[in-house]
Amino acid sequence: MCGAYIIAFTTNDLPWLIFPGMALVAFGGISLIMTNVQLSNMFPVGGGAVVGIISGAFDSSSGIQLMVKLGYEQGISRKTSYLILASTHVLTFVSTFLFLPKDYVHPVQEEYVVTQEIELEIPEKPGLDSGKTEKKVTSKTTSDNEVNLSSLVRLIRTPTYLLHVMWVCLLQLRLFYILGSINRILEKELENKKEVSDYTNVMLYVLMGGIVASPLAGAFLELNISLFKNSKSSFSRSVKPNIMSLTLTSALGVVLSVLLLLEDPSHLYYIFVFLVLYRSIFYTMVNAYIVLAFPSAFIGSLIGITTVTSGVFCLLQHALFEWSARRNAKEVNIFLIVLIGISCIHPFWQWIACRRAEQRESTKE
């Protein structure tokens, strides 16, 4: 709300207000999604779809800026639009104080354990079959209301988490670069400013499709959860359903990069469609993976650490913009294809870890 008010009062005489305004809007948005995504734990079945719906609503927020742009073209000032937007933020207070749970959304009886070799023993989610522990337990059992720093550090140091942070950083850099350079791409490939404005509107309309694409991504994740719910290993039941979606997201990033290499105006619509698919599945998996693979008591902390780390990493986009301006945008896109290829290590590693966990369970039997 404060960010929207500050942007509303930004003028040519006070241009610097845009920076604290946008920073506050970004901070508020991230805080909201970090909180609301944990609601998926309230649903024994369909948690992945819930994450998809919430991510879709977050993803389609670009439509708000489209409304501001269209309103400005019709004579509605930016100040008026942002004052109206700020007033609608009162609804978040209603949701926070009347509807959201006041504590962790998981029952406090749920327990997790930290192991020595596979440092995280995934807790059983409601609705899933109970499973055996992967290794001998080396730390005390802890309930959700006894969160401690040492356990959080152990979770952060696991390949299950570190590789996900790497995956998020690399794919988000790809996303931020295209969003930051799309206007330059349109100006280069189109003939006049009116066409650039028209295609910008089309892109924003297409991006609003995230509210449909993200729930579909969540439904696809739910399908994978049902396929692997009878896995012998509890680790596999929590991690394996994510592998297909993680791989699909990386593949979409490669396709998007190849389309950008072609530099053909006739491909712009394809770029917009693949962009909304890529962004929707990406943001769904950023959150859904952590929700499924880690204890609910740590979800907020882990999503927050992931968000901050990837945000700092994505400052590299400015170096990519400079590289593109001084040399060639094709070189940057080829470089990003290589980075996306590296991101495939994440689903591949998790697949190997799941196979090993299942083999150990088979050996015990």
Would you name each region that the model predicts?
Residues P15-L32, H267-I281:
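Hydrophobic core of transmembrane alpha-helices in multi-pass small-molecule transporters
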Residues G29-G52, L186, I281-F294:
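Intracellular juxtamembrane helix-capping segments at the cytosolic ends
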Residues L32, P44-I76, T80-I84, T88-T92, ...:
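Glycine-rich segments within core transmembrane alpha-helices of 12-TM secondary carriers
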Residues T80-L98, V332-Q350:
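Symmetry-related core transmembrane helices of the 12-TM Major Facilitator Superfamily/SLC fold
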Residues L100-L162, M166, Y177, S181, ...:
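Long, low-complexity inter-transmembrane loops of multi-pass membrane transporters
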Residues L152-A217, Y283, N287:
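Extracytoplasmic gate region of multi-pass secondary transporters
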Residues Y199-S231, T249-L252, F313-Q317:
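Transmembrane alpha-helices of Major Facilitator/SLC transporters
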Residues S231-V286:
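C-terminal transmembrane helical hairpin of 12-TM major facilitator-type secondary transporters
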